[in-house]
From Swiss-Prot:
Pathway stated in the Swiss-Prot or TrEMBL entry: Amino-acid biosynthesis; L-proline biosynthesis; L-glutamate 5-semialdehyde from L-glutamate: step 2/2
Species, as recorded: Rhodopseudomonas palustris (strain BisB18)
Keyword NADP attributed: yes
UniProt protein name: Gamma-glutamyl phosphate reductase
Superkingdom to which the source organism belongs: Bacteria
PROSITE patterns in the cross-refs: PROA
Pfam families, A to Z: Aldedh (PF00171)
Cellular-component GO terms for this entry: cytoplasm
Family: Belongs to the gamma-glutamyl phosphate reductase family.
UniProt feature coiled coil, ranges: none
Length: 433
């Protein structure tokens, strides 16, 4: 235990000590952000390369820390989906390291000139990407978020304060140690990637308050209650990552084999991730597709819930409740419904979707275009699984979250989305008449 944490434990007023510690973290992050904002690309990439090496070299320590977190979660009665999100394996740590390598290789967004034009008076105006400043990332059970958020913030010239959930506390500490090792090796301030070193939930409230103006944006990664609290209490802008109530619509013009493959992957590849599909909508004009699609899910171990028409397909189908259409199961459960074409599918999604990810399976390009244009979601797919809702799959290397709002960033939030812009105006002595 560090001296500062011992002081909090033994303080007459632990709340005041925690507030002082968090305020200091914010001030240190702000100072680091000023350094990162002007850090050369080569120096940031040197840190990223060192971080990748450290993650690979310290994989055994990361896995040991994670095993302790998982054991504690199991003892506490955590669900299988929760355990899946919490668990790291050698392969998952390797993917984490690979993602850092991808972020190393992508273009540095800072300083990019996105537009340039000349005014009639001879002035030249440029719009240039700049960092946001200090980002606070509050997340729950996914320890890989610590790495993703840390390296994306670094690449985009931002400092970041990581507040992982108590369930992944040890895992995040081990990963954070590797990130700090990389910063140190490249000569960048260690406060560029800061981890809240206590489990006290009061730290979240202090982050939401902005730490005396030292936090510029907050990214919540977690369940509905966490996101709701952040949106209700935050005094700084929020990139909201809401639940993934995602749908797959199988149109009358869909190839059945393709539909079976996509639906199975969308639900069962990893049922607990935010890109998993929760509802299957099938065009009533191709009701013959219902039985094979339902059977495919059932035989893969997925619980299927449906109305009377769906239940008649197989006695294993369970009745669907109205609230099921609004539920992110995070488990091997899928609601199934027959709808009267693409318009009815769009209406159902408009009523029950969470603006996260939606997919259509069809060979009819006009129907696909209608769906892609009209559905209100951050990510819309044609003939592909919803599980591609991932920054790594988009070529971003990783993501800090999937923003489901419509301001500033939407969809996978990568390095480019963690920048704002400024206008640079070049004159030759012009004055305004």
């Amino acid at each position: 235990m560090t001296a500062s944490l011992k002081a909090i434990d033994g303080a007459a007023d632990p709340g005041a000590e925690l507030a002082a510690m968090m305020t200091a973290l914010g001030a240190q992050a702000r100072a680091a952000a000023r350094v990162l904002a002007i850090a050369p690309t080569a120096q940031k990439n040197e840190a990223l390369a060192a971080m990748e090496r450290a993650i690979r070299a310290h994989t055994p320590a990361i896995l040991q820390a994670n095993a302790e977190d998982v054991a504690e979660a199991r003892a506490g009665g955590a669900t299988d989906a929760f355990i899946d999100r919490l668990t790291l394996t050698e392969a998952r740590v390797a993917v984490m390291a690979d993602g850092i390598g991808v972020i190393h290789d992508i273009a540095d967004p800072v300083g990019q000139v996105t537009e340039r034009w000349q005014r009639p008076n001879g002035m030249t105006i440029e719009r240039v990407r700049v960092p946001l400043g200090v980002i606070a990332v509050i997340f729950e059970s996914r320890p890989n978020v610590a790495a993703d958020a840390g390296v994306l913030a670094l690449k985009s010239g931002n400092a970041v304060i990581l507040r992982g959930g108590s369930d992944s506390f040890r895992s995040c500490r081990a990963i954070h140690d590797c990130l700090v090792e990389g910063l140190r090796e490249a000569g960048l301030p260690e406060a560029a990637i800061t981890r809240v070193p206590v489990r006290d939930r009061a730290a979240v409230g202090l982050l939401l308050g902005g730490l005396d103006g030292n936090v510029d944006v907050i990214v919540p990664r977690g369940g509905k209650s966490l996101v709701a609290r952040v949106e209700a209490e935050a005094r700084v802008p929020v990139f909201a990552h809401l639940e993934g109530i995602n749908h797959v619509y199988v149109d009358r013009a869909a190839d059945l084999d393709m539909a079976k493959s996509i639906v199975l992957n969308a639900k069962m590849r990893r049922p607990g991730v935010c890109g998993a599909a929760e509802t299957l909508l099938i065009d009533r004009a191709a009701a013959s597709n219902l039985a094979p699609l339902v059977t495919t899910l059932l035989e893969a171990g997925c619980e299927v819930r449906g109305d009377d028409a769906v239940q008649r397909v197989d006695p294993r189908v369970k009745p669907v409740a109205e609230e099921d259409w609004d539920t992110e199961y995070e488990a091997a459960i899928m609601s199934v419904k027959l709808v009267d074409g693409v318009d009815a599918a769009l209406a159902h999604i408009a009523q029950h979707g969470s603006h996260h990810t939606e997919a259509i399976v069809t060979a009819d390009q006009s129907v696909a275009s209608k769906f892609l244009n009209e559905v209100d979601a951050a990510i819309v797919l044609h003939n592909a699984s919803t599980q591609f809702a991932d920054g790594g799959e988009f070529g971003f290397g990783a993501e800090i979250g999937i923003a489901t709002g419509k301001f500033h960033a939407r969809g996978p939030v990568g390095a480019e989305q963690l920048t704002s812009f400024k206008y640079r105006v070049h004159g030759t002595g012009q004055i305004r008449p």
